[in-house]
Amino acid sequence: VDYNSLFMKKEHEDPLATLQQRYPIRYHNPSRVPVQLLIAGNKLRIRFFVRYGKNMLENFPGTDVTYADIAESGIRKNWGGLYYFPWLADDGFERAHAKANVRILDNNEDPSEEEISPLQPSVRVTVEFVRFGSSTAASGFPKQQFYRVKLTGGSFFPAHVISPPWRWYWGFFRTLQLESLHLNWCRNHPGIITLQKEQDRYTFQQIAAHETGHLLGLGDAYGASYRFFYEAPGTGSFMMCHNRKVQSAELEMVFHSHMTNHMQYFPRKFHYETFISGLRREYQLQFHALAKNDRNRH
């Protein structure tokens, strides 16, 4: 089962529309929204208002680049780019681009419609970061709310996104999802990111991009304990499964999150053998982590 293909097939017969027409996302009070989707036609800018912990501004081992810079680079690389949807209409960009190509290549100042061949329309995504304390933040967004990113050197707890304690537990009754016990997501309170120190730069970037998916309003797709160790079918190549690549289906789930102000979750189910196998594997991993920490202390 290919989750991405099923997602696309479901919407293949929908009427064509630009991104702005299909998802007219607006924020009543933008200064209270730390992560914003800014849409014009088929152009999407994801703007992050971020406040880094002190150690995120330290240099990554073996480089003269900070953890924060490397994380931002990974998020831009993974979430930026072109995304294709079966319902997407051209906002004029592809037609204008095709017309300009004919003008230059064929020396034709006024090509006809038959002479131009626009490419398939795509959502064009760019990523922007506004850091707390920067001149941009001070001058352009003086009352803006920021989300926090922390860095830990411990290995017992993996990287995660969590809500402040006052938002714990009651979110379950909004979603009936175990994931929402400690991440009670909404646009005004997307969560606090905690990243782990990593030796490998690429791994750190991919983890940062995955955790950013939670910040944007996506649940996990991999076989986590709160998913009964059940991996959503057909999501092996997804960012929210194995930190691989952001798929169009994932981005569309983000649109739904910000339209509805509710986190979007991948399908899960309880399967006894899968659950027992996952529980055994989780115990072994925790045991090895504890043993490693004990050796490091001695």
Indicate residue ranges for each PLM-predicted region.
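The catalytic-center signature of Zn2+-dependent metalloproteases
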Residues: T194-H298
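Extracellular/periplasmic catalytic domains that process cell-envelope and extracellular macromolecules
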Residues: L38-A40, S139-K143, Y230-G234
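Metzincin-family zinc-dependent endopeptidase catalytic domain
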Residues: V65-R227
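N-terminal low-structure segments adjacent to metalloprotease catalytic domains
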Residues: V1-A100, N296-H298
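Extended hydrophobic/Leu-rich segments
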Residues: Y3-F7, L16-L19, Y23, I116-L119, ...
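Residues in well-ordered beta-strands of folded domains
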Residues: R47-F49, R148-K150, M240-C241, Q264
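Short, surface-exposed beta-strand/loop "edge" segments at domain boundaries and coil↔beta transitions
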Residues: Y52-G62, L151-W170, K245-L251, F270
